[in-house]
Amino acid sequence: MVADVLRQSVLVPISMYPQYPVPRRYTTSVFKEYQKKKKIYYCQRCLNHDVPRPRKNHKCECPYADCTCEKCGLVEKRRILNIRLQNYNQFNIENENDSKLIIVEDDDKKKQGERVPNCQKCGQHGRKSRLKGHKRSCPFRECPCAKCAVVSERQKLMADQIKIRRRQRKDTLLTFAKNSITSTMFPSNQISLNALNSLLYGSINTSPQPLLSSPTSSDASSCSPSMPFTPSIPMFMPTSADCSPTTQTPTSSIPSSIASTSPLMTSLPLRLSGFPLLNIRDPSAEASLLNLGCNADAAALLKTILDQYRMLEEASMSMSSSPSKDDESGDEDSDGLNSNSIIDVITV
């Protein structure tokens, strides 16, 4: 049964199969005809202003009909020359020989669909010569007649217009390439420049500052920029009590206005982990210090913290192995170190 079906299918002639026509759009001749039919001519004045608009039924609606720019001036000159040349061809026939058309045979045959330009100067004198390879051998190359002069002037105008079109095409390609590169490097989902600036500014302001600043300067300008207020000078003035021969201690009397109005002294919790030089391993000692800070008022708490930090600084300076140059320079360096350390402690 299967063999009979296969035999019948083999014996079916090819003509009985459905014939699907080959799409005509794939053939070369039809494509060229389609291209010829769909060729669109654009208004030259609108093209000068980068606005491609079809020329058909556009003359009365052209927004650049009265434009006096340099590019549109070339279009107007070319139009005038074409009108003049047509008038010469109609009314100024020099003799009978010029009225007869002389065709110069060309070895190259005209291909189907190929545009073959002819020499305009020879055409004005009744001859038809192919333009390819004819420029130097043209017998009317330097003809002084009025028609050849019009043709030469029109050729110059056309060359200028071609330069303008090439420049416009080049600018369009450069703009397209620039936009594509910009869209690839900077996608739309990336944050804007203002958002990036605010993010960087916020990260700089919230970045942690070092606990000890450089001892090269004793001025209060070395304070951290994130400090919300500027401390007054009497807060850091030393007193005669609890002074060592080489160091100075901060004052024991703090103005009540600073202690009462500054929320930084009372609201922020104090932890001994903020002092890296304070190596207290006994939990009871740490608890006593914290209880002392919690029970005392703001002035006594600040005095206790500064005294503890001063003692740690003295111990660290005595253990350092770098000798000082002389007594006066050593005193000045220690004063600068103490003042900078006090400023950093208050900032923390």
UniProtKB/Swiss-Prot annotation:
Origin species: Caenorhabditis elegans
GO cellular component: nucleus
DNA-binding region: 43-91, 119-166
Primary localization: nucleus
Stretches the record annotates as Disordered: 316-348
InterPro entries in the cross-refs: DM_DNA-bd, DM_DNA-bd_sf, DMRT
Name listed for the protein in its UniProt record: Doublesex- and mab-3-related transcription factor dmd-10
Residues in coiled coil: none
Function: Transcription factor. Plays a role in neuronal signaling in polymodal sensory neuron ASH, downstream of sensory receptor activation. Required for maintenance of AVG synapses.
Tissue specificity annotation: Dimorphically expressed in the dimorphically connected interneuron AVG; expression is observed in the AVG in males, but not in hermaphrodites.
Keyword GTP-binding: no
Keywords: DNA-binding, Metal-binding, Nucleus, Repeat, Transcription, Transcription regulation, Zinc
Localisation per UniProt entry: Nucleus
Molecular function GO labels: DNA-binding transcription factor activity, RNA polymerase II-specific; metal ion binding; RNA polymerase II cis-regulatory region sequence-specific DNA binding
Entry superkingdom: Eukaryota
UniProt family annotation: Belongs to the DMRT family.
GO annotation, biological process: male anatomical structure morphogenesis; mechanosensory behavior; negative regulation of synapse pruning; regulation of transcription by RNA polymerase II; response to osmotic stress; sex differentiation
Summary of the knockout phenotype: Decreased response to nose touch, but normal motor and sensory behaviors and normal levels of glutamate receptor glr-1. Small but significant decrease in response to high osmolarity. Decreased reversal responses to direct stimulation of the polymodal sensory neuron ASH as compared to wild type. Defects in male mating behavior; reduced efficiency in locating vulva of partner. Alterations in AVG interneuron synaptic wiring in a dmd-5 mutant background.
